[in-house]
Amino acid sequence: ILCNHVLEHVKDHIQAISELHRVLKKGGTLIAQVPIDEKLETTFEDNSIIDPNERSRVFGQYDHVRIYGNDFLSLLNQSGFKSKGIQYANKLSEVEIKKYCLQKEVIPVAIKS
């Protein structure tokens, strides 16, 4: 399953992650990309922020409901996945990264065991 920048829009992301785990066959792979602020130890949510401009400032986009922290892989593991972060861009040259317009982000890969 490829879940590319979806979970930050979902109100109950824990339920969504559990559902992804449920529908994935044993040994299947989930790639779940989300915006991660590496300066945050834990994921941040604040439902009291309703102004679109303030949401953009805090969460990076007006329609996001959270900004993930370094605990994202733990959130996946709590739902039964075995996950790790892969830095694919580190395997490429700077020329390739620019050519393909890649970001140097960690790609969360989770396996259903």
Feature locations, PLM:
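A short His-aromatic
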Residues: 5-9
